[in-house]
Each structure stands twice: as C-alpha cells, then as structure tokens.
C-alpha cells in the first residue's frame, strides 16, 4: 500500500494568555494513497489542527508527519508543491471573479495557460458555477463562495487534497456535486483527506475513517468496520403501543416521536422485529448508521437529541 500521509505521535499544545490547550494528544494515522480518508469527531476534537500540521501551516509540538514521503516539518516545500488545501475558515480573494479565482490559482501553481483554462472551464460546469463565472467572489452567496474554493482545489493537479469541511453550508444539490468532484479526483488517483460533520457524507465518500476525540484516534477503519465496533450495531424503529419497559430486554431504548428506537445486537434486533410484525406494529430494522455509532461513542446517551427520528418505520 502506498502511503499518502503517515503521522506518528503527533501532539500539539496551543498556548495563549497563559492557558494551555492540548489539541492533539498523540495522533497516529496512515492514509493510503488514491482514496478518500475521513476525519470525523466533535467540535474541538482536533481535526483542523491535524490538517494544518499535515499541510505545513502549523508546527506540531512533537511527533512526525510525512506527506508522500516528505517530512512536513523538515521539508515543507516538497510537501507544499504536491498538496492543495481548503481551510475550514477561508476568505478567497474578493476582488476576483469566479473564473479568475480558479484560473489564477492554477496559474500560480505553475500550470500552463491552456491546461489551466481547460480545467477551469470544466470545474465551473461540474460545480454549477458556470453561470456565475463573471461574478465577483465578494458578491457570491456563502455557499457559492465555498463552492468556488472547492473548485480551485479540485481543479488543481495536487496529489493530496486537504478538504476541511468542504460542504458546510452547501445546499443538498451542491453537496452532491462536490461529492462527484471528489470521486473524480479519486479516479484520477489523487488522495483526499476530508473532514465533515455530515456522517452520511463521511460514509459515502471515505474508504477509511478515523474518529477523533480529545486529540486522539478513538477508532479507525473502514466505515463497515467502524459500524461493527459498537456493542449494539443494529437499530430497530418500532411504532405503536409498546412501552419502554417491554422493549428494554432487547437493547438500549430511546423514545422518539411516534415510537421507540432500539439499539440491539443482531439476534435481539431480529427477535424484536418479528414480534412487532406479529403484533402488526410498523417496524424497521437496519444496521446502525455512522451517526448512531458516533452518538453512542462520543455523544450523549441516545434519545437526548434525536430530532430526525420520525416516520422511518
Ligand atoms: N489558535 C488556537 N489557539 C488556542 N487554541 C486553539 C487554537 N486553535 C484551536 N484551538 C483549540 O484546539 C482544540 C482543537 O481545535 P480544532 O480546531 O483542531 O478542532 P476541530 O476538530 O477542527 O473542531 P471543529 O469540528 O469545531 O472544526 C480546541 O480545543 C480548540 O479550542
Ligand atoms: Mg475544524
């Protein structure tokens, strides 16, 4: 396996106004080349800090990171030539229009004019920005501005792309256009390190994922591996006149609008589903989603904040 990013024992402590924050407490990660790797975790977990270190914008307090075999601390120049970054907070150059933003970015990276023009045209169509090509970046809506940043980076020929929440604030259609663009980048044998709070997105795009919590890697693996690593990997949604007490023997129960949600092991999940069907209650059984896993591992107990669970039976 070719490695795009190899991090060992990476720590980072921020010091400001006499206060110390340990943002990374020892991160080991191996990101294979030619695939999308997802970093997920709660706000403040350390994802952006890791991306800034691996993309040579921030020095680690200790540990090492190599990108495509080049040391990010000792040899940042070699790394910078081969990567492109969408930072979490980005302010594109406001006096340019959308076309210029993308085209000049590619030129600045050393791409010949003809190639830069061809790629700019293609990415503007791909991300539905073509009709806005002459619009000043400062006149774009927030989501369109974000798309323009995504366009710049995806049109580049960088081998490793660091995308820190590229789809935050995008409408559902635009989000899927970005997914397609990321998938195309992977077909071109590039590597994407992605952070996102949309766990359906993390699951749809990533070959592997790391769940970061408190500056450490809590879990790492393929989405399926991660989903199977919780004690109760199935979710059963039951509607109808069933009490919490009746459901408790089957697993972990949460009351949701119109019914109950039970997280259970496979056997119990099947049994409960059969029983509910026999009684004529609407029921559905499915593997736990990545979001379920996330909530079970790093969230509050299920049910405390589960507003989306309605009408899924
Ligand atoms: N410049 C800074 N100075 C001091 N503390 C910082 C700085 N940047 C980040 N931190 C702290 O480091 C920790 C990790 O932050 P980081 O931005 O890496 O988290 P994140 O996982 O990207 O979160 P989010 O999902 O909200 O983007 C947090 O506790 C944050 O407050
Ligand atoms: Mg962040």
Locations of the language-model features?
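A short, flexible loop at the N-terminus of ABC-type nucleotide-binding domains that lies
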Residues: 1-7, 13-26, 76
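Conserved ABC ATPase "signature" region
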Residues: 103, 107, 114-132
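ABC ATPase "signature
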Residues: 220-221
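Short, charged/small-residue-rich alpha-helical element at the C-terminal edge
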Residues: 232-304
